[in-house]
Amino acid sequence: MIQVRKSFTLDQFEDHLSSLAEGESRLSLPNLIKAEAVGATASLMQLIATWGRNPDAQLKLYAPELGSVSAANFASSPVGLAALNAARSVVSQNGESVSRRAAMMLAERYVREMHDGRLEDIKAANSITLLSMDNAHHLGRPVRLYSGAGETVRSARDLADFLRNCFTVLMTSETRLPAALDLAEPASGILFEAFQNTHEHARTNWKKDELPRSTRGVTVGWRYVERARLVDAAGHHRVFRKYFEAVAEDEGQGRNAQFIELSVFDGGPGLAQSWFRAREPRNIRHGDVTLEEELTAVYACLQKGGTTKGNNSAGNGLYRILRLTSERGGFVRLRTGRLSLARSFAESTLFKPADVEMEDAVTGSTAAQRHAWADGTVLTIMLPVRRGARQ
């Protein structure tokens, strides 16, 4: 059984994916997850999506029965709700069978708060997560992310207002910097492009059939970390360490470093598989695509004009994300399929159209490195909040 710890890390995420690749189908999640690592909540969502593809996926609750407070607390959390949506069967702490439908009903109040309630009520530690559950019959797509009847992703302007509200809720009055709120506008462009990409490409499988259970979403986080502790927070991910080392040396920005985190996640076919399915019926999971071809396909998605649609004006979204992140001196992590990629922009830089090469997040190598399979895509962006700077 895969047992996720409260202090979930990206290193553990990779270990758990390896267990899934070996056929493990049982998953146990704690009622409270700290998920302090960068992009950890979104990575948990990807782990859950990958696990949920197993027809024997069984979820074990840390609750004696559905009527317990612990069961309600678990269901009323983004990780708990996503796990219940993906599970094929659910058992209690005692191993007794539990109704998945009844367990999900415990989350109704939480889902309503996620749609149009107070952000303070869905805040978890240092982040706010919104889930879009495409298979839900009611309240599937949050009005904070969708307009109209839930078929159109909100504009970047609307998302900028949402981000300002998130930043205000997440930051304390003592630590809030004016530059943080200034980041809402450029960050909204990143959020729009990334989430729009999930809406267009991540609701179906590699055959373009609608996914029976689909959870997509966004996490907005705020990090306030002592510079001396930054490097240790990177774990074994070498590209993270390189970025944090550069940030830690910038003592002129104060004892503590502040970051805005944006993560967008989905359980779709992944970037490379979306690229191939638009051109030729080659399945990565079936061994039809080499690792090098998968990496090349991901880079094609990131290039200016790269698109899986016939419209020549489309396909600039992921490229714009890299460009905006480079302009702000940020960091990008991309986990999709067999690839774990990252790019550090410790210094603000002019981004060129062909400059999309990334590094393996763990080894730092620019060559393709094989990792355990992960369904869907997680894109995590970190943007530094600088003192005295008008972003």
Please report, for each region that a protein language model flagged, where it lies by residue.
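N-terminal pre-Walker A segment at the start of P-loop NTPase domains
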Residues: 155-168
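Conserved ATP-binding N-box helix of the HATPase_c
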Residues: 179-256, 319-325
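Acidic ATP/Mg2+-coordinating residue in the GHKL
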Residues: 266
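A short amphipathic beta-strand at an alpha->beta junction
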Residues: 56-72
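Eukaryotic low-complexity, non-globular regulatory regions
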Residues: 32-34, 40-52
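Flexible, glycine-/charge-rich segments associated with ATP-binding catalytic modules
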Residues: 1-29, 49-56, 60, 78-136, ...
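Conserved short strand/loop->alpha-helix "switch" segment adjacent to the catalytic nucleotide/phosphoryl-transfer site
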Residues: 2, 33-39, 168-192
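N-terminal targeting/assembly segments of extracytoplasmic apparatus and virion spike/baseplate proteins
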Residues: 131-151
